[in-house]
Amino acid sequence: VILFNVKESEQQEKEPEEVQAEVTQNPETMTQTAESIEDKYKVFDTMSEDWGSDDLEGFVFYDLPEQYADKGYFPEKMQIYTRCLCKQYDVPYALVLAIIEQESGYEFDKTGDGGQSKGYMQIYEKWHTDRMQNLGCTDLMNPYQNVRVGIDFLSYLLKKYGTIQDTLAAYNYGEKGAREYLWSNGVYVYSYNTAIIQRMKEIEEVVGK
């Protein structure tokens, strides 16, 4: 910790009221902030909304849990798109929501592991270049492309391993990692897949299967 000694006469710290007054009196700053926020969410306008209307009978929109409402964002158009993909791939919708909650807290622009894992489903591009190419996806920070790649991967894992438990282990560790660090040591149930399966069941009570 570096400490600086500042003479009392040189201190420029302002009282909270002064700072608030400056912010309030600076409409240009407020406009720039509003524009930057608006720009951030423009990515959700990159997808047509004329798909999936025939598949939404009984669909229930999901309200984010309170602890994720501040930073998380999962608008209705994103929910519809995700639900349609899940039906197309035969992947449980509640499972995808539980994974998104665990991985990113519904933050579509979240990055982790030094920027390597990206988006809602925290996908590593280096492990999914072929999958992305096959799906025509080029940007994992685009929420629509992110969930498409993630759901496609989940579909592959579910078909290969047969259980949600093992699918989640392979999703979390990678297939090779799950074999080497979990299954070869007799570990099939652990904190990650247990937590997500529990949340999946809770979410199913709200949105259905």
Task: Label the predicted regions.
Residues 47-209:
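Catalytic glycan-binding domains that act on GlcNAc-containing polysaccharides
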Residues 3-81:
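N-terminal export signals and maturation junctions of secreted/periplasmic proteins
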